């Protein structure tokens, strides 16, 4: 390329200094433009780690042999064989195993679908399309609450396709709540979105309710009376009363603001980056076991964890002191666990210690407090969803940047093994017996993704112990309440870190340190080009 650029200069008349100087300048400009274009392209690729596609049968084991994890099945929308290929897996964002272990649900963000599968056979049971039309689907909608005003769009707002993000079960697993990242026409997610409620008996949408802009995380309270939805888009959290068993009687309770609500006024004809720069970027959301508080991770802004007093219907403030970029929250065995996306870390603190700090805030005169003495465990960069074995012994973390699932021993807070997963993992869930872990790989920048990996987990000592989710005291089936803290057990169980009402019964590529290499190559290429410019100019001056 450079040879061709230099060659074009040979026809410049030698007896015209002005033209020669101008021509030299144009050549240098062309060289520099080309160099920077090459460098920019290479650097942009540096943000996309290498793609990984582990083969079925891939296995990892802890050094002491206490836990072994094996990739046993896949659902993938690329290559593969007839029994693994699935065209409905389109940017799978999250996965949720039904509390009774009969089926599991995958949210395909870009496919605008939720797919249900038989847990034992992996047979597809239904494809639930999130596409709605005003007039035809009016009966699905709850009454407008007045809490979510429309500011930019006003016509046919109930005709859209919804992009499903996360999910939570309610009413003993009868219903699955699925918020939409945005309505398809709202290109910058600045007006109300919606949440769909799927009846898991029929696998059909039976209710639609409005939400704030860009909802991501959704959680059900331990007593099964409230659903909380955190709005990434504008620093707010919505609460829905679901105390009735009838969907038509569910209604919005209130919207609470974390410090300040963002004023959204983006173009209607040009997309902007809403994944970044969205205030606190509210993400991980979980109720405390006593139903009293809702805690919400702040992935952006000033970071921390927002605390809402459900009883007083009041935002208290943000607890600080943990690492920045909090992504997912789980409460298990008396501990609050966090995944730290950027740092690739799992942190924890006794829940009682965290709440002692949180209760020092009042939402007015004191809106921040610092919690210290966190325990840390390094896992892979890009730690996204975390889930915990039923006995609380092991944490499983989907690590996006390195395309790995990490396993952490909670006794030592050390990573004991990790295993490859299709790039780039985001969602994760574990079966109620701890024997299977399901991971969704969404992909990034049109690389990797479009896969669900299914792992079988074997333990030297299978999970059996159960603990109080509030204080960590041992728990048995006969206990109706915790003898230590008095938490009522009746009507609740702990599954995957979310406390929900009881339900009756192709080769792996190492991604380590490889993402930085294109930057070195880009720098080297740019240096070489600049050196070429220097010697070219020097030779022209000699002439």
Regions found by a protein language model. Name each.
Residues 491-518:
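Short, aromatic-rich amphipathic segments at membrane interfaces
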Residues 516-528, 535:
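Short, hydrophobic alpha-helical membrane anchors of single-pass surface/secreted proteins
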């Amino acid at each position: 390329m450079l040879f061709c650029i230099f060659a074009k200069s040979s026809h410049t008349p030698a007896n015209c200094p002005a033209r020669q100087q101008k021509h030299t300048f144009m050549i240098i400009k062309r060289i520099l433009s080309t160099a920077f274009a090459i460098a920019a392209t290479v650097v942009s690729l540096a943000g996309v780690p290498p793609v990984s596609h582990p083969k079925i049968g891939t296995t990892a084991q802890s050094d002491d042999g206490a836990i072994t994890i094996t990739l046993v099945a896949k659902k993938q929308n690329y290559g593969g064989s007839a029994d693994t290929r699935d065209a409905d897996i389109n940017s799978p964002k999250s996965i949720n195993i039904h509390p009774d272990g009969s089926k599991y649900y995958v949210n395909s963000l870009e496919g605008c679908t939720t797919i249900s599968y038989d847990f034992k056979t992996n047979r597809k049971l239904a494809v639930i399309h999130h596409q709605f039309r005003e007039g035809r689907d009016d009966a699905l909608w709850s009454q407008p609450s007045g809490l979510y005003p429309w500011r930019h769009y006003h016509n046919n707002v109930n005709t859209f396709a919804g992009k499903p993000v996360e999910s939570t079960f309610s009413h003993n697993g009868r219903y699955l709540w699925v918020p939409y990242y945005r309505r398809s026409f709202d290109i910058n997610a600045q007006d109300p979105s919606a949440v769909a409620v799927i009846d898991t008996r029929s696998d059909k949408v039976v209710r639609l309710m409005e939400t704030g802009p860009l909802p991501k995380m959704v959680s059900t309270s331990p007593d099964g009376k409230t659903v909380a939805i955190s709005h990434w888009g504008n620093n707010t959290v919505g609460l829905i009363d679901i105390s009735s068993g009838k969907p038509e009687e569910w209604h919005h309770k209130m919207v609470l603001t974390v410090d300040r609500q963002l004023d959204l006024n983006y173009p209607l004809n040009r997309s902007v980056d809403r994944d970044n720069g969205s205030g606190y970027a509210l993400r991980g959301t979980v109720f405390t076991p006593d139903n009293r508080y809702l805690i919400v991770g702040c992935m952006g802004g000033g970071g921390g964890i927002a605390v809402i007093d459900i009883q007083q219907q009041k935002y208290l403030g943000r607890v600080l002191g943990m690492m920045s970029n909090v992504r997912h929250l789980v409460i298990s065995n008396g501990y609050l666990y966090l995944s730290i996306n950027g740092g690739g870390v799992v942190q924890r603190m006794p829940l009682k210690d965290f709440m002692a700090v949180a209760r020092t805030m009042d939402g007015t005169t004191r809106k921040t407090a610092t919690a210290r003495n966190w325990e840390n465990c390094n896992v892979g960069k890009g730690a996204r969803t975390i889930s915990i074995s039923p006995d609380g012994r092991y944490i499983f973390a989907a690590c996006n940047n390195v395309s790995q699932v990490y396993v952490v021993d909670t006794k030592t807070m050390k990573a004991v093994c990790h295993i490859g997963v299709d790039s780039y993992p985001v969602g994760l869930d574990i079966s109620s017996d701890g024997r299977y872990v399901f991971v969704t790989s969404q992909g990034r920048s049109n690389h990797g993704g479009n896969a669900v990996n299914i792992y079988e987990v074997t333990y030297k000592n299978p999970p059996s112990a159960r603990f109080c989710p509030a204080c960590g005291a041992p728990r048995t089936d006969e206990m109706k309440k915790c003898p230590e803290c008095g938490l009522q057990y009746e009507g609740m169980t702990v599954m995957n870190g979310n406390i929900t009402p009881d339900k009756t019964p192709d080769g792996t590529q190492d991604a380590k340190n490889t993402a930085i290499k294109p930057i070195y190559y880009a720098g080297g290429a740019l240096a070489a080009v600049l050196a070429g410019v220097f010697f070219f100019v020097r030779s022209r001056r000699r002439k």
